From Swiss-Prot:
Gene behind the chain: surE
Cofactor binding annotation: Binds 1 divalent metal cation per subunit.
Keyword terms of this UniProt record: Cytoplasm, Hydrolase, Metal-binding, Nucleotide-binding
EC numbers for this chain: 3.1.3.5
Name of the protein in its database record: 5'-nucleotidase SurE
Function field: Nucleotidase that shows phosphatase activity on nucleoside 5'-monophosphates.
Family according to the record: Belongs to the SurE nucleotidase family.
EC class: hydrolase
Cofactor: a divalent metal cation
């Protein structure tokens, strides 16, 4: 099996190294990740300048672009084979509910999915994450399962792991995405030169976090696995919008 790894925290991130080490006994692993932290880059592609691919002493490749750039470049321009799987992570912090829209971690996996490759995004639900070994073990188990029972169609899984020791994880739960309250307002401040600058506000707290959601599973010590899709069509409004457009 051949696996392409990426992330949005950068090629130097501990979560990426932990995942690469855990998967090495299971597959031929190639790492292509951003040269710096690109958290929140979502599915953006770099179109205004060329991309450069370099190799670090660790053997990991890094790109002066976004997580989506990394996977797109690797699959369509670097590798001489199509990976059997694309895995993105381990992210430092959760990607649940609305986070998935903004997440570079999820975006890297999404690009693999759009290129027809089974893909997994994995996040450790704590920005000061400690138990990367737990998340790596979860992903290794998923890879073995997918090896033994390959999906019949391209699959995109969003995995969130509680930041705790393996023995303290209560199990795995297949979930739907929850929802957050709206984000906090931007923070207005000044830089050392007295110029007004703004920082994007914090993400909103969980709003829809009931049983069956990713928020609920992780809060209760379970690994959350949410199958994702790309069709954003709101089918329930098609008739009402059609009626609204009639003269």
């Amino acid at each position: 099996m051949r696996i392409l790894l990426s992330n949005d925290d950068g090629y130097f991130a501990p979560g990426l190294a932990a995942l690469a080490e855990a998967l090495a006994p299971l597959a031929e692993v190639t790492v292509v990740a951003p040269e710096r932290d690109r958290s929140g880059a979502s599915n953006s592609l770099t179109l205004d300048r060329p991309l450069m691919l370099r190799q670090a002493p660790s053997g990991f490749y890094y790109v002066n672009g976004t997580p989506t750039d990394c996977v797109h470049l690797a699959v369509t321009g670097m590798l001489d084979h199509l990976p059997d799987m694309v895995i993105s992570g381990i992210n430092h912090g959760a990607n649940m509910g609305d986070d998935t829209i903004y997440s570079g971690t999820v975006a890297a996996a999404t690009e693999g999915y759009l290129l027809g490759i089974p893909s997994i995004a994995v996040s450790l639900a704590n920005h000061n994450a400690l138990y990367f070994d737990t998340a790596a073990r979860v992903v290794s188990d998923l890879v073995r399962r997918l090896q033994n029972n390959p999906p019949t169609e391209p699959t995109l899984l969003n995995v969130n792991v509680p930041d705790r020791a393996w023995d303290a994880v209560r199990g795995i739960s297949v979930t739907r995405l929850g929802k957050r309250h709206k984000a906090e307002s931007v923070v207005k401040t000044s830089n050392p030169r007295g110029q007004t600058v703004y920082w994007v506000g914090a993400a909103g707290a969980a709003q829809d976090a009931g049983e069956g959601t990713d928020f609920h599973a992780v809060a209760n010590g379970y690994v959350s696995i949410t199958p994702l899709q790309m069709d954003l069509t709101r089918f329930s409004q098609m008739e009402s919008v059609t009626a609204w457009l009639k003269p």
